[in-house]
Every structure is written in structure tokens, then in C-alpha cells.
Design a protein with these regions (language model features):
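Conserved structural motif at the start of ABC-family nucleotide-binding domains
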Residues: 6, 20-23
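Helix-to-loop junction immediately C-terminal to a conserved catalytic motif
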Residues: 52
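ABC ATPase NBD coupling module
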Residues: 68-83
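Q-loop/switch helix immediately C-terminal to the Walker
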Residues: 88, 94-110
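Conserved ABC ATPase "signature" region
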Residues: 109-123, 145
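Catalytic Walker B motif of ABC-type/P-loop ATPase nucleotide-binding domains
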Residues: 153-159
Length: 211
């Protein structure tokens, strides 16, 4: 089992002057699979985006494989180390087509193979905004598989099964929990959470371990 360890120490995140995440301390061993659950608006997405450098208004320490990120080069390294399945695509940004999303993994061939296995190969020429929610999640999962083929050792997935049909949820859970990486998955899907090694819960910006 591969993967990198992830360590957070006294992490706080803000949106403007509002604290969204407070005093988060977390140690995840290399290769562990961690489910991050909790109430809507409790700070899960914000915390994951901070790990990736997509939310910069934070304080504290986040180390991935022992490395911090401060410079643009270090943040670029962080994003290569961490595959990412977002809850929703960034509005108005590239890539626009499925094929461009898959190519952004750094391993377009492997991502395209995964897209075929996940049943969305015929949609790769379509603009992302025309895909259904479940088709888009399948495309992002395929991109993540490509990113891992390209060298990512951590997968951060934000509600990756929320839009999938029942069979798709089972299939995605199998794939996610079988990848040779450290997995942090934000989810409200109890079956997926139960398949992880640890379950953490966020409430009002604070984190606690529940299983
Ligand atoms: N761009 C933003 N600007 C201002 N406030 C924001 C922004 N994004 C999130 N927030 C606020 O930050 C808090 C945490 O939001 P976040 O999306 O991290 O929660 P979450 O736990 O992922 O929620 P959910 O389970 O509903 O996806 C919420 O109160 C939310 O309203």
C-alpha cells in the first residue's frame, strides 16, 4: 500500500472574518482511509481546499509527506501529490471538455481507460457543464485515477458518490477504498464511511474522531 502521511496542526480557516474551521489537529498515516463526515456547513470542504491550496485564508500547519507548501512551486507540488475530486467544478474555469479534464491528470491514457470502465468514455468530447451530476462524478473519479497513475499518493474526494446511482455508489466505493493511496473522503454516505479505516466528524468547524 502506497500513500503519504498527512498532518495538520492547529489549522484555522476563515471566509472573510468568519471562522469556518477551528483548531484542527489531525494525523493520518500513509495509506490510511479516512472518512470525514459531519453537518452541512461544518467546514469539511473548506478544510480540504486548504490542504490543496485552493483556500488560502488559513493558519496553522499542513504537511503532506512531511512537506509544507508556501511558494507557488510548493503548492504545485502539493497538487501533484494530492489527486482531487471536488464537490462541484470551479465555475467558468478550464478544463471545459471531459477529455481536457482527463488530460489534466497528467496521465491522459490511464484516465481515459478509467473513464471507459466507469461508462463515460462516450462523453469525453462533451463540455463538462452538459454532463449529469453522476456522469460528472464518474469523469472526476477517472481523472483521479489518472492523477494517481501520474504519481499522486493522496486522494482527497469531496462527496464523490453523492450524485451516483446505487450501483455506481458501490462501484465508486470499491474503487476509492482500493486505490494504493492515502484517502480522505468527505461523505454523507454511511456505507462508504463504514468501509474506511477511520471516521471523523466535523461540527461547527471542529473535528473529532468517532470511529
Ligand atoms: N465562498 C464562501 N464565502 C463565504 N462563506 C463560505 C464560502 N464557502 C463556504 N462558506 C461558509 O463556510 C462554512 C463551511 O462551509 P463548507 O463548504 O466548508 O462546509 P461543508 O462541511 O463542506 O458543508 P456540506 O456538508 O454542506 O458540503 C459554511 O458556513 C459556509 O456557509
Amino acid at each position: 500500500m502506497g500513500g503519504l502521511d498527512v498532518r495538520m496542526r492547529d489549522v484555522h480557516c476563515w471566509h472573510g472574518r468568519t471562522a469556518a474551521v477551528s483548531e484542527v489537529d489531525l494525523e493520518i498515516a500513509a495509506g490510511q482511509r479516512v472518512a470525514l463526515t459531519g453537518t452541512n456547513g461544518s467546514g469539511k470542504t473548506t478544510l480540504m481546499r486548504a490542504v490543496l491550496g485552493l483556500h488560502r485564508h488559513f493558519s496553522g500547519t499542513v504537511l503532506v509527506g512531511g512537506c509544507s507548501a508556501r511558494t507557488a512551486t510548493e503548492w504545485a507540488q502539493r497538487r501533484r501529490a494530492c489527486a482531487w475530486i471536488p464537490q462541484k467544478p470551479a465555475a467558468g474555469r478550464f478544463p471545459l471538455l471531459g477529455s481536457e479534464l482527463l488530460a489534466s491528470s497528467g496521465a491522459a491514457g490511464e484516465a481515459a481507460d478509467a473513464a471507459a470502465r466507469l461508462g463515460v468514455a462516450s462523453l469525453t468530447g462533451n463540455p463538462l457543464h452538459t454532463l449529469s451530476g453522476g456522469q460528472l462524478q464518474r469523469m472526476y473519479l477517472a481523472r483521479a485515477i489518472g492523477s494517481i497513475a501520474a504519481g499522486a499518493d493522496v486522494l482527497i474526494a469531496d462527496e464523490p458518490t453523492a450524485a451516483l446511482d446505487f450501483d455506481g455508489q458501490d462501484e465508486a466505493a470499491d474503487i476509492l477504498t482500493g486505490l494504493p493511496v492515502t484517502l480522505i473522503v468527505v461523505t454523507h454516505d454511511r456505507a462508504l464511511a463504514n468501509r474506511c479505516d477511520r471516521v471523523l466528524e466535523m461540527a461547527a468547524g471542529r473535528l473529532r474522531e468517532i470511529a
